[in-house]
């Protein structure tokens, strides 16, 4: 005895096919807001390390060598949870909708960004990433009283060449004390 | 390519070994058989016996109690064979690995400490389309080995 | 037993004072009306008998706190929900006792409550406590090399820090004694750990006589990850991502239980929109889990076509998840104090269209399950669990509701938006596999109606989706949170110690209580029915094998954690700095 329900469903699926043609056609459903592969925006990253602090499985690592700071996401450990996207102050990380990430070699599954650092002229140590200093200067100068703008710009150019320890040591020589702005 | 090699590549048989973990990757692998993604139209079949398989798919972190069983299954599959590791836990231990010095005592290690792996599919869990992409890469590798 | 629920707290306290006399040390109230009672350790069996006979209580779980040289504190959590009642806050009673560290022994209550067997086996293995009179004292979860090979460190180096008696040696798992010599017609059939019918790894041993099963035995522990110990090293906020990965099918339920317990610790109130969105995702997850289970069940019977139909209609639910949260499985929507993403106005019509498709399909499946001859022949009268057996073993969830035991945390202890929406609890009197199928399919229809009510509420209410949360929680607070997962009741117990890292987290999942009931149901059935009986309780082995914390502290001011030598050195430095 033939089952009537099975026949009815079979005719319905002949009329409208449910299967997608994936490797030979587009994937099924990729809405916006989907959490796929995380990608860095090279111009916006300031190298602050906020994403490194908040990553739950510790998939983000920071390495410093040769005057450059390199931030790396290990895609094999990443949970694709989008916490780094929420925490980043410059919106430099976005989770795109790419999901085809299979590789033959595990060391290729990573995403990196490199930021150069400023060298102190007195002691030679690398003390801060360069985009941080230039962004701070632009933001301070855009909101300050135009009367003080010129002095502050000149001072900024001198002070941003020394690390905080050397700035304290050479404070007399550089005329570095906050009261001169009052 | 001879007739034997052509038939092996055009219809690979897959053995699925669930090695613990949270089951997220397992339900995405079984969802590849359902009508929407339907891998059987590409010639792929799931078998229960390792003696009849070409590709071994491993998902889940591998706990200490299951390492012996996994090694035995790998040795029973006849050559040529390809191993695919699916999901964050199988690649690096994922969120169960611990931080700093501390490694969770229940972990037998990521899969490539126990058996050699050919294709890695990252994701937590990866979409069924990403798994199909990984299996397509595995079939490419099988073609070279035959 | 006829009594009213109005003065339950006072009645319990007065009866305990009468019976125990001097051994009763005091009581205090915790958050949301939970009651905590301190007693001396010799009276535990007496209290268990009294609570079972007079008040018809149900054991939720047993947990252990480790206080160093002060000793171990053992906690017994009870609930009182076997009676019918209207929407009132249900009482949870916790009985606490202290046992000394040099001689950790206590009476076992497995002869009164069978549901304590798994919990006591786990405690005795991981904390070193001896339960006198335990029914089944065999190996449970730890790896076989424990403690001789712990991260490659030799035991001789650690033995200076802890006395040898406290380190329990874990041998191999021994199956129950089988007397088949002299009876050549009996034999043993092992199923697992790798089996093509099961998606997870566990090991059943069936003692059979021809085709009939006489007895069954179960070994779990292949999925042990050490989760509760991992949770004690990270902050409250990072633990959400670990608790999400305890089980992939009920992941949102685990995070809601964890967040509910932490919110009870800190006295945090959720905003309205956050509550409705959380309830909406929770009911969607119940629909997806029941459809998944129905498909797997049909596959085990042999009706592969129905397996494909169920999973095809489940894809619409996963599309809604992807639209709202960004991922099909493991949607990280919860955070302490609210949710992370919002449901906007243009999403709502698309969601309602997909819900219409699922509702039409679900009604079709209910009709199919009641009239299709294949399903009825394979499931009616198979694997029966009577009402008395269900109460004795202590099952929860749809397994209990199919045996006429009406317990549901959403009705007994209302939370989120379940008090504001109207829905019914589904029960059936038979107790066989057919009743379990019908209960789950009818629950899908109830969940769809709750989802529609939540969407209507979301259209009218505005406001934020998260509340303000402190970074550290006060010292010495504890809380128990209970939540209804698709498989039953899920309980979390958290204790805080004044920092941003929790002191102790104890998880008790519903599969812990449901899995041993298969050993009752498998008697006198045939081998061919074994897979469908085992699958009818919806076993989730990922939920059953977690772990608890092991801290061995010596009285001589040296802290020890028997997992890594560098951790030992760090802890001893910390302790001497504190002293």
Where are these regions (language model features)?
Chain B
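Iron-sulfur-associated redox domains of electron-transfer enzymes in respiratory
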Residues: 1-146
């Amino acid at each position: 005895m033939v089952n009537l329900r099975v026949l009815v469903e079979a005719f319905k699926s002949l009329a409208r096919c449910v299967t997608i043609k994936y490797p030979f056609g587009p994937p099924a459903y990729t809405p916006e807001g989907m959490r796929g592969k995380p990608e860095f925006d090279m111009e916006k990253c300031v190298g602050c390390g906020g994403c490194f602090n908040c990553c739950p499985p510790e998939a983000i690592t920071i390495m410093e060598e040769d005057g450059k700071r390199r931030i790396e996401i290990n895609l094999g450990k990443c949970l694709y949870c989008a916490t780094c996207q929420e925490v980043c102050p410059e919106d430099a990380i976005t989770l795109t909708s790419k999901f085809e990430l299979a590789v033959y070699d595990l060391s290729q599954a990573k995403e990196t960004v490199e930021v150069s650092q400023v060298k102190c002229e007195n002691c030679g140590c690398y003390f801060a990433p360069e985009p941080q200093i230039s962004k701070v200067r632009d933001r301070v100068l855009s909101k300050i009283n135009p009367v003080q703008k010129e002095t502050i710009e000149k001072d900024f150019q001198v002070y941003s060449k020394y690390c905080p320890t050397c700035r304290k040591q050479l404070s007399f020589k550089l005329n570095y004390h906050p009261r001169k702005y009052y | 390519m001879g007739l034997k090699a052509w038939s092996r590549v055009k219809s690979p048989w897959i053995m699925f070994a669930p090695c613990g973990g949270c089951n997220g990757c397992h339900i995405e692998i079984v969802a590849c058989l359902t009508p929407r993604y339907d891998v059987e139209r590409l010639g792929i079949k799931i078998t229960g016996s390792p003696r009849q398989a070409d590709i071994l798919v491993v998902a889940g972190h591998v706990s200490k109690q299951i390492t012996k069983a996994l090694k035995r299954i790998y040795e029973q599959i006849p050559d040529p064979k390809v191993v695919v590791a699916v999901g964050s836990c199988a690649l690096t231990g994922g969120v169960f690995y611990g931080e700093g010095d501390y490694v969770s005592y229940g972990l037998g290690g990521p899969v490539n400490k126990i058996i050699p792996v050919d294709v890695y599919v990252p994701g937590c869990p990866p979409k069924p389309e990403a798994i199909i992409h990984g299996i397509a890469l595995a079939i490419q590798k099988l073609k070279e080995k035959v | 037993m006829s009594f009213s629920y109005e003065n339950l707290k006072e009645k319990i306290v007065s009866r305990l004072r009468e019976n125990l006399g001097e051994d009763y040390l005091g009581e205090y109230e915790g958050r949301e009306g939970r009651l905590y009672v301190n007693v001396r350790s010799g009276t535990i069996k007496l209290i268990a008998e009294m609570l079972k006979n007079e008040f018809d209580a149900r054991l939720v779980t047993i947990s252990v706190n480790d206080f160093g040289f002060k000793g171990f504190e053992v906690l017994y959590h009870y609930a009182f929900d076997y009676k019918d009642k209207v929407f009132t806050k249900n009482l949870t009673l916790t009985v606490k006792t202290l046992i000394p560290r040099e001689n950790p022994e206590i009476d076992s209550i497995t002869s009164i409550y069978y549901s304590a067997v798994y919990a006591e086996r786990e405690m005795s293995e991981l904390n070193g406590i001896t339960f006198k009179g335990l029914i089944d004292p065999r190996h449970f979860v730890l790896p076989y090399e424990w403690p001789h090979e712990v991260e490659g460190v030799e035991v001789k180096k650690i033995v200076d820090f802890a006395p040898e008696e406290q380190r329990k040696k874990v041998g191999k798992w021994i199956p129950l004694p089988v007397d088949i010599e002299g009876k050549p017609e009996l034999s043993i059939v092992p199923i697992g750990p790798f089996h093509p019918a099961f998606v997870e790894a566990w090991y059943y041993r069936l003692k059979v006589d021809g085709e009939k099963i006489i007895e069954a035995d179960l070994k779990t522990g292949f999925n042990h990850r050490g989760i509760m110990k991992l949770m004690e090293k990270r902050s409250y906020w990072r633990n959400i991502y670990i608790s999400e990965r305890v089980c992939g099918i009920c992941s949102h339920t685990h995070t809601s239980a964890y967040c509910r317990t932490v919110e009870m610790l800190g006295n945090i109130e959720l905003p309205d929109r956050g509550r409705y969105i959380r309830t909406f995702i929770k009911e969607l997850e119940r629909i997806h889990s029941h459809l998944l289970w129905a498909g797997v069940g049909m596959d085990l019977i042999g009706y592969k076509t129905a397996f494909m139909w169920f999973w095809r209609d489940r894809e619409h639910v996963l599309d809604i998840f992807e639209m709202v949260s960004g991922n099909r499985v493991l949607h990280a929507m919860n955070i302490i104090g609210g949710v992370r993403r919002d449901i906007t106005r243009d999403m709502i019509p698309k969601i309602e269209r997909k819900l219409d498709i699922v509702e039409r399909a679900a009604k079709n499946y209910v009709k199919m399950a009641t009239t299709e001859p294949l399903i009825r022949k394979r499931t009616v009268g198979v694997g029966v669990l009577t009402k008395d057996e269900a109460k004795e073993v202590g099952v929860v969830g749809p397994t209990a509701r199919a045996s006429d035991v009406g317990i549901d945390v959403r009705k007994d202890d209302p939370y989120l938006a379940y008090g504001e929406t109207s829905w019914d609890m589904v029960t059936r009197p038979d107790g066989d596999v057919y009743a379990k199928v019908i209960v789950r399919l009818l629950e899908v229809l109830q969940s769809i109606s709750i989802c529609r009510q939540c969407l209507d509420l979301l259209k009218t209410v505005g406001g934020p989706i998260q509340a303000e949360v402190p970074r550290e929680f006060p010292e010495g607070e504890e809380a128990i949170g209970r939540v209804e997962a698709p498989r039953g009741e899920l309980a979390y117990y958290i204790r805080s110690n004044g920092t941003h890292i929790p002191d102790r987290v104890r998880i008790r999942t519903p599969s812990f209580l449901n899995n041993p009931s298969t050993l009752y149901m498998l008697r006198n059935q045939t081998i061919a029915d074994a897979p469908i009986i085992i699958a009818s309780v919806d076993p989730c082995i990922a939920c059953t094998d977690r772990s608890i914390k092991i801290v061995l502290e010596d009285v001589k001011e040296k802290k020890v954690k028997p997992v890594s030598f560098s951790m030992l050195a760090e802890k001893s430095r910390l302790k001497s700095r504190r002293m």
